[in-house]
Amino acid sequence: MVGKICGTGSYAPHRVMDNHDLAKIVETSDEWIRERTGIGKRHIIEEETTSYMAGQAALRAVEQSGIDPAEIELIILATSSSETVFPCAACEVQKTIGAVHAAGYDMNAACTGFVLAFNTAQAYISAGIYQTVMVIGADSMSNLVDWTDRGTCILFGDGAG
């Protein structure tokens, strides 16, 4: 059995921090950041949480896919920045989208998290354990990053998909 992507959704916070904004708080420049990373701007949370962003992305994916949330059997949320230890953020997404029959868990694997979660979902489907799995990647790294460290703060933003 092979899995397929039935729908996608994303959420990015409204607040945008461009490289010029970042240069006001750490010694850097737009040119320096772009040369090293190609990044020109990043989305930053204000009131949102990781689970909120994941839930909004999930709602959009469900809408696009046409799948009844009650058909979802498992939700895997790849995140390194959940705001709570429990319930896991995947359980918050389950509640948000109405996936009343789904199990859910968070997977923390940093930058490779979404790929690992996707491969895990594929393995569950191939093994015949689940048929309908939702995979989400979501992080709010702006809460964790050291905004005085020019080498790392330029890399991270917030969002979900």
Segment roles from a protein language model:
Residues 1-73, 97:
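Conserved "HGTGT" condensation-loop signature of ketosynthase/thiolase-family condensing enzymes
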Residues 4, 76, 106:
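Conserved beta-strand segments that form the floor/walls of ligand-binding pockets within enzyme
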Residues 18, 43, 78, 102, ...:
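Residue-level detector of alpha-helix boundaries and kinks
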Residues 48, 80-83:
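Short, surface-exposed acidic/glycine-rich loop or hinge patches that mediate macromolecular interfaces
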Residues 59, 63-70, 82-161:
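Acyl-thioester C-C bond-transforming condensing/cleaving domain
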Residues 74-80:
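Short glycine-rich or small-residue beta-strand-to-loop segments that form or flank ligand, phosphate
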